[in-house]
Amino acid sequence: WIMGYMVNAIYQIDEFVNLGANSIETDVSFDDNANPEYTYHGIPCDCGRSCLKWENYNDFLKGLRSATTPGNSKYQSKLILVVFDLKTGSLYDNQASEAGKKLAKNLLKHYWNNGNNGGRAYIVLSIPDLNHYPLIKGFTDTLKQEGHPELLEKVGYDFSGNDAIGDVAKAYKKAGVSGHVWQSDGITNCLLRGLSRVKDAVANRDSGKGYINKVYYWTVDKRATTRDALDAGVDGVMTNYPDVIADVMNEAAYKNKVRLATYEDSPWVTFKK
């Protein structure tokens, strides 16, 4: 999965997919009442990027729905996975469940079209704080209450705070999650970060006993870093330059080892070598 980073304006969906991304990451900010409000990152953000692009969240969802609904004039068949980077740092811990409920209602209405031929992309809810694990139950309970438990097949989870793997496992246990887990690791492209925790996550994924199904690394903009990440065995790389990742994947060392994921590749099933 080549994951386009910080895609917060509708026009950027096409821009990143046309550069080679089959997945995008979008920031979601919340208002004081835990309503998802804007697709907005803010300052500071990755070096070389404008941090200030935004849409109203519901408008972005409608644009995303168009891009991921077969038959729509804006349809992009390659776009199969969307990571919502939930900026819950602005919320009190006791608002996490409420944020999950509201997120579910927004997605159901504006993205899934109330279960009637909505967008088809898989969705990852990425949460920065382990203490906000109740967001997951708020989300899953709401989809069930609204009569659409089947849509949970399209939803996965990520805790993005670079916490110890054991602590993340405990948070999922509390949230009642087993499966559909992506594990992120990384840091802004302005700084360097080693791959030791990525390797721990890959080992957990491949052990058959861990909680992780897929691993992604961010933010990967350079060819050398891309090679290191692929060599470490990640499933996804989040990038500002999808074309750089695509180029590296076409190099002799990789072109017979890795390929771009398609809609038929489940993002929840651990790839067995």
Swiss-Prot record:
Any one GO molecular function term: phosphoric diester hydrolase activity
Catalyzed reaction equations: an N-(acyl)-sphingosylphosphocholine = an N-(acyl)-sphingosyl-1,3-cyclic phosphate + choline; an N-(acyl)-sphingosylphosphoethanolamine = an N-(acyl)-sphingosyl-1,3-cyclic phosphate + ethanolamine; a 1-acyl-sn-glycero-3-phosphocholine = a 1-acyl-sn-glycero-2,3-cyclic phosphate + choline; a 1-acyl-sn-glycero-3-phosphoethanolamine = a 1-acyl-sn-glycero-2,3-cyclic phosphate + ethanolamine
Cellular localization per UniProt: Secreted
Cofactor remark: Binds 1 Mg(2+) ion per subunit.
CDD domains with a match to the protein in the record: GDPD_like_SMaseD_PLD
Name of protein: Dermonecrotic toxin LhSicTox-alphaIA2bi
Known cofactor(s): Mg(2+)
UniProt family annotation: Belongs to the arthropod phospholipase D family. Class II subfamily.
Keyword Magnesium included in the entry's annotation: yes
Record's function text: Dermonecrotic toxins cleave the phosphodiester linkage between the phosphate and headgroup of certain phospholipids (sphingolipid and lysolipid substrates), forming an alcohol (often choline) and a cyclic phosphate. This toxin acts on sphingomyelin (SM). It may also act on ceramide phosphoethanolamine (CPE), lysophosphatidylcholine (LPC) and lysophosphatidylethanolamine (LPE), but not on lysophosphatidylserine (LPS), and lysophosphatidylglycerol (LPG). It acts by transphosphatidylation, releasing exclusively cyclic phosphate products as second products.
Disulphide bonds in the chain: 45-51, 47-190
EC number: 4.6.1.-
Organism for this UniProt entry: Loxosceles hirsuta (Recluse spider)
